[in-house]
Amino acid sequence: QPVSAILEAAEEHRADVIGMSGLLVKSTVIMKENLQELNQRKMAADYPVILGGAALTRAYVEQDLHEIYQGEVRYARDAFEGLRLMDALIGVKRGVPGAKLPELKQRRVRPSAAAAEVEERPQEGHVRSDVATDNPVPEPPFEGTRVIKGIQLKEYASWLDEGALFKGQWGLKQARSGDGPSYEELVETEGRPRLRGLLDRLQTDNLLEAAVVYGYFPCVSKDDDLIVLDEQGNERTRFTFPRQRRGRRLCLADFFRPEESGETDVVGFQVVTVGSRIGEETAKLFASDSYRDYLELHGLSVQLAEALAEYWHARVRAELGFAGEDPADVEDMFALKYRGARFSLGYGACPDLEDRAKIAEMLRPERIGVHLSEEFQLHPEQSTDAIVIHHPEAKYFNAR
């Protein structure tokens, strides 16, 4: 959403507060630019701003962005903290007795400039990391793509991360004072009963349309590039990934056989969706001002898409022959203690959203009702994509 559209809507609807959520790494830059635009338009004093999302941290918002914004800017960890902040901001704005904002996060003590320069001096060039290149390459069951539709909720519901849902999406937590029920008690008395009710409703109202398109492709790597090959062994498409400039100097390309080895590796891609109906239902709730119901159903829909992605990644590991290495405990599965990893576009190791167009060209996700917008966003919203890597050392990392 361009900032001009946000500001026009704020003026048209006489908004009290502007809220923005950033999921992707690029969002940190966009948020800063948006706040600077509010400054330039002399609108900062009129609009307090609440920021949140996976790409942002409280320190970044309440330290760095607070320093540049000429109005009030605060961080909300989730939608429920956002609602509490809204109450506080409105109370302060209207002069309600006793209304006040929570304290800003205090700035950390920074190292001296000289020490920081030595510590942060990056290495240059394409110096490869120490990732092993002699791991066995699994044999995929097929090359190309397959479409799977009609996946039942019971098949992937066990992959639903209740902790991420209850804490991250629904804001379920014990009172800060320590009084009242514990988090575990809240899970039993509120979380799981609400979850069961919503899951029953999703099935009764037929709101889920879970589907997957995925595939395996031959590939090699060269420097920071992953080169996907066609059936004749010629280059089909190429992904260029960022490399860490310090530490292990990891790059996603390192997890595939280098071109000079003469060997061919295999890479997986997947796009999953729980369909558009659940998004349409959340939109109805929002339009009817049923905000808590909206937040709960929307949060569940996001986590169900993630559960489907995890379920299908497990299917890929089975097809590649190493599902036996998966941990037995479900919490260890949620902690990603299995072999390999799936990397979604827009995050630290592969931040370039434009690469989604390359995945879309190979998988043709429109076959399961998923489309790519001009801004390289997946629609329906409750959809995810991923590069699936089999290498035993492949784990999440940030290339920044």
Enumerate the predicted regions with their spans:
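Structured, hydrophobic secondary-structure cores that serve as assembly/anchoring elements
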Residues: 309-391
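A structural micro-motif
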Residues: 47, 71-72
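C-terminal substrate/ligand-recognition segments
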Residues: 293-315
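Alpha-helix capping/termination and helix-coil
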Residues: 14, 38, 42, 278, ...
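Active-site loops and adjacent core secondary-structure elements that bind or stabilize anionic groups
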Residues: 80-295, 299, 320-322, 355-356, ...
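Short acidic-hydrophobic, aromatic-tinged amphipathic segments that line or gate anion-handling sites
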Residues: 73-78
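Cofactor-cradling patches in redox/metallo enzymes
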Residues: 1-66
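Short secondary-structure boundary/capping segments
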Residues: 34-37, 63-68, 90-91, 174, ...
